[in-house]
Regions:
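Small-residue-enriched transmembrane alpha-helices
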Residues: 6, 33-36, 40, 45, ...
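Transmembrane helix-loop-helix hairpins at the membrane interface
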Residues: 86-90, 105-219
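Juxtamembrane helix-loop-helix connectors linking adjacent transmembrane helices
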Residues: 20-34, 58-134, 152
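A generic alpha-helix propensity feature with a strong bias for hydrophobic helices
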Residues: 46, 96, 138-139
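N-terminal, membrane-interfacial amphipathic/helix-forming hydrophobic leader that caps
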Residues: 1-70, 209-219
């Protein structure tokens, strides 16, 4: 069911971009990205809501462990270190072995494109999408739903590995895969250890925020 949801969501997202006339464009406006993201995420949230009502308690927050504690603030330095150090260290061997694929330009292309498309007040919308919405939705999907259910079936370690691989793969950028997989392992371990989404969400927020700050400072 989840694979079908993913397929439908991506088809809908692609249709929206095409209808708006930005298919194949090098730089897509931030408002188009926002609309596309909303369409892309809606089927996932819909399935989570349905799952909570059909197979859970009906309490969305409880069913998907969406709670926070003060200790989750450790996710801030963890996310920053993951962005500035972990991703770089993990990607470096691939850059040495396959420089034409894993060069810095390719690894940073998505972040650069997003930042280049945002001007003036649109930067605020970009921050909302990348720093707030994306981490919450992705942690609900990949940790609270996919990893949790895989853990029930195959155990925590296998669940972390598979959900992390899936997380990195669905971003559809081979140059980003090593770094995203390593970061997803961090997020998966956070969720497995705490049994809550708080730490993984805060870590993810800090990770994405750091990427935007780096983009801004290097312009």
């Amino acid at each position: 069911m989840w694979s079908l949801t993913y397929l439908i969501a991506n088809i809908c997202g692609s249709i929206v971009i095409s209808v708006l006339g930005y298919a194949g464009e090098v730089v897509t406006p931030t408002w188009v990205i926002a609309v596309s993201a909303l369409v892309l995420w809606s089927p996932f949230i819909g399935v989570l809501l349905w799952t909570s009502k059909r197979h859970g308690s009906g309490n969305f927050v409880k069913d998907f462990s969406l709670s926070f504690q003060a200790t989750d603030l450790w996710g801030v330095p963890l996310g920053i270190i993951s962005q500035l150090l972990l991703v770089v260290v993990v990607t470096l061997p691939f850059q040495w072995l396959f420089p034409s694929i894993f060069n810095s330009e390719a690894v940073e292309k998505r972040a650069n494109d997003l930042f280049d498309a945002a001007h003036g007040a649109w930067i605020v919308l970009l921050v909302v999408i990348v720093v707030i919405c994306a981490p919450v939705v992705e942690e609900l999907v990949y940790r609270a739903f996919i990893q949790h259910n895989l853990g029930v079936a195959y155990g925590a370690r296998i669940a972390v590995l598979i959900s992390s691989f899936w997380f990195a793969a669905v971003h559809l950028q081979i140059a980003e895969f090593p770094g995203l997989f390593a970061f997803a392992l961090v997020l998966g371990i956070c969720f497995a250890r705490t049994k809550r989404l708080g730490l993984s969400i805060v870590t993810h927020v800090a990770f994405n925020a750091t990427a935007l700050v780096v983009m801004a400072l290097t312009r």
